[in-house]
Amino acid sequence: MKVLWAALLVTFLAGCQAKVEQAVETEPEPELRQQTEWQSGQRWELALGRFWDYLRWVQTLSEQVQEELLSSQVTQELRALMDETMKELKAYKSELEEQLTPVAEETRARLSKELQAAQARLGADMEDVCGRLVQYRGEVQAMLGQSTEELRVRLASHLRKLRKRLLRDADDLQKRLAVYQAGAREGAERGLSAIRERLGPLVEQGRVRAATVGSLAGQPLQERAQAWGERLRARMEEMGSRTRDRLDEVKEQVAEVRAKLEEQAQQIRLQAEAFQARLKSWFEPLVEDMQRQWAGLVEKVQAAVGTSAAPVPSDNH
């Protein structure tokens, strides 16, 4: 009987899980059309689009997503995309502020304040997404070994609400940036040639940055990892080349020291030979003189011996 109840319970849970996954996967997204409408190709919008696509993948709550949610990989990726979005948004806002110089100070301050508020709301919503995923990871870890179906359903609902808030705040931010840009255009149309001259390089720089960011957006994570690997490999090869060059320098220094030592040894040998020659020149005359004196002494002794040995003549005849 217990086995039968267990089988029924497993079948019921599996059916619930299949229904939840089907509901998540087949959920209509009417906001996609609106998303494509406000995306005009600005750098911050491209970065936000990458954040949006990654969040959509997380919202599927597939097995891979659930596995990675138990680690900090998903939140790290989302935070990196969030930082990139805010960085690009700040850069775009700075460019527009440079173009708003001819506008009245009061108008510029009001526009800047409204834009900062919209930017803060967008950042807070993106931070809420990361915080909700961290909370979900903690709850799942606390319920280890138990059913987490209710947590998944609740997380899916929160993510849907957060995505709608993100879309609304992004749309509001885009409209305020359009007002900002219109103010810059109005200032340029007042005949300030200096502003016109500055707008040309800024627009070209924006196109270059948008093209660069757009190309990076199309690269999958694997290609980026390969690019990082290539840069790391090039760095290692550079370090190896420097090490080999350093070893060659050490070898050259050792060879130079060896040559100097051999040269010094040769000089010492030459000095010893010269000193030996000087000693020989000092003592050789003395030896020759002693040899001559000895030879003379020998001759004298021989002469004396010969004289004493001669016969004495006799007087008897």
Swiss-Prot record:
Post-translational modification (record): APOE exists as multiple glycosylated and sialylated glycoforms within cells and in plasma. The extent of glycosylation and sialylation are tissue and context specific. Plasma APOE undergoes desialylation and is less glycosylated and sialylated than the cellular form. Glycosylation is not required for proper expression and secretion. O-glycosylated with core 1 or possibly core 8 glycans. Thr-307 and Ser-314 are minor glycosylation sites compared to Ser-308.
Range of residues in the leader sequence: 1-18
Sequence repeats: 80-101, 102-123, 124-145, 146-167, 168-189, 190-211, 212-233, 234-255
Localisation per UniProt entry: Secreted; Secreted, Extracellular space; Secreted, Extracellular space, Extracellular matrix; Extracellular vesicle
Tissue: Produced by several tissues and cell types and mainly found associated with lipid particles in the plasma, the interstitial fluid and lymph. Mainly synthesized by liver hepatocytes. Significant quantities are also produced in brain, mainly by astrocytes and glial cells in the cerebral cortex, but also by neurons in frontal cortex and hippocampus. It is also expressed by cells of the peripheral nervous system. Also expressed by adrenal gland, testis, ovary, skin, kidney, spleen and adipose tissue and macrophages in various tissues.
Glycan-linked positions: 26, 36, 93, 212, 307-308, 314
Pfam family, one: Apolipoprotein
Sequence segments annotated as region (Homooligomerization): 266-317
Protein name: Apolipoprotein E
